[in-house]
Amino acid sequence: MLAAVALLVWRVLSTGRPTEPQGVERGSAGMASASGSEERAAGEGREPAGAPLTSIAGRFTDQDGHVRALSSLRGVPFVASAIYTRCPSVCPRTVAALHRLDRSLPVGDRPRYVLFSLDPAYDTPRVLRAFAATQALPAPRWMLLRPDTASLPAIARALGLAYSAGEGGGVAHTAVIAIVDSSGSVRERQLGLAQDPAALLAAWRRIGMTQRLPAD
């Protein structure tokens, strides 16, 4: 793990990229690793995100135990992220950023949120449902999905994130919030731990408010 972090830092120093990207960006990533109370962040250049999320096949189970096809999300813009429920610090900060976005919008303009688990072996529907309750993520507007293991690499490519098994059952992963358009394509991404609420709000208004969802 230390060797991987050292390599990332070397890349930052050699390319001049910031260690913690800010704002809504394309094609770069802030790597966040958590083990216990420890966080590390580094920047690593990446290609723009891959295939549309809604074109990814696989088995996705939501917090209520329903099997979902990502193609069913096509037609309505949404905000996507990736978390895992045992994450001690990075993921709660991501969820807090999503709540800030939600509170900044009138009820009728608020997005649908889709959060993919990076720890499907542990994050069963029951665990995801408990997490949703404690984090105030009410269905159906907040959808927490447990992907099958084979689908995770495609999800990571679509969101533009990197992840790997960490220490003590943790997951080293990129902190990312993505704005997804009605075709299922990631249009813009906010990366790293230094979230920019104004930029995220502007991106949603520009891309996501082409369709409205009914209030909860």
Question: PLM features: what roles do these ranges have?
Answer:
Residues 1-57, 210, 216:
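N-terminal targeting signals for export/organelle localization
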